[in-house]
Amino acid sequence: MVAAIRVPRSQRAKRELLKHAPKLVETGKKTLILHGTKTSAVLNSVLADLFHLKRDNAVKYSKKNDNIRPFESGGETSLEFFSLKTDCSLIVYGSHSKKRPNNLVLGRTYDHHIYDLVEVGVENYKSIESYVYDKKLAPKLGSKPFFAFIGEHFESVEELKHLKEVLLDLFKGEVVENLNLAGVDRVFVCTAISPTTVYMMHCALRLKRSGTSIPRIELVEVGPSMDLVVRRHRYPVESLKKEAMKTADHAKKMKNVTKDPVHGKLGKVYIPDQQIAKMSLSNDVKGLKRERREAKKNKDHSKKQKINPE
């Protein structure tokens, strides 16, 4: 499937295309959540909880897709089409079969083409609804989570290093310069149990008094939690990776230009002192023409007085 290139015919359509255009500072990545040909009740709950955690920046399709085979040649075409259609650069695809039960594929795209993929199996899953806790501790919409990766396998095993990168990209959100302490209210704890298994749990942060300026932090499980068993991987091609890692040059700072919240953009213009005495005046100046006409009129009037004396 190839989406047709459309030329905007209105200002509204033009603004929508500009939102999707490359930017010097990119906005947060959107996530596309898809169902395969067959999904289990566990997998449906996993996809629903992931959408709940990323509902401010995610698109979820509930319709089953028969022609998506992410790891087969040509099977990723539909994924790339949906990525382009929804402007999503992160993909979560769930499927269930006898060979690969409760299968979850996490993927990233570059320029709406598959960049890399990691396939995991979901085991020992506990949904958000199965946890009982004070609802005041529920993570707020738009909050940024901490990540804690426990275990040496995240540094020594290539598959887990790849999974770590994808998980960080999946929940990173928008890039910000400063963080409000009240906005950091949750943490994902990922523990490498073995070279192929990662236990992942989602916890809320409860701040308590400690007698100092730094509060004491307690972890309260709010769900979901699951074991992720690593299966297949698709690493990025080296040439594509090099292209994706390129960074744009920042625009040069304009001299003598400032921004004001009231007046907007302000600039200083330096003009040299004008030497009026040295300015050359042309003969085509309207004021001079008027003076010539008046002088000629006075001259003719004086001649008439001499010819016809009273």
From Swiss-Prot:
Task: Answer yes or no on keyword Cell division.
Answer: no
Sorted UniProt keywords = Nucleus
Q: Which GO terms describe its molecular function?
A: rRNA binding
| Source taxon at top rank | Eukaryota
The residue stretches assigned to a coiled coil in this entry are none
Q: Which family would the database say this protein is a member of?
A: Belongs to the RPF2 family.
What this protein is called in its record is Ribosome production factor 2 homolog
Naturally occurring in which organism (per UniProt) = Oryza sativa subsp. japonica (Rice)
Recall the taxonomic lineage recorded for the source organism. Answer: Eukaryota, Viridiplantae, Streptophyta, Embryophyta, Tracheophyta
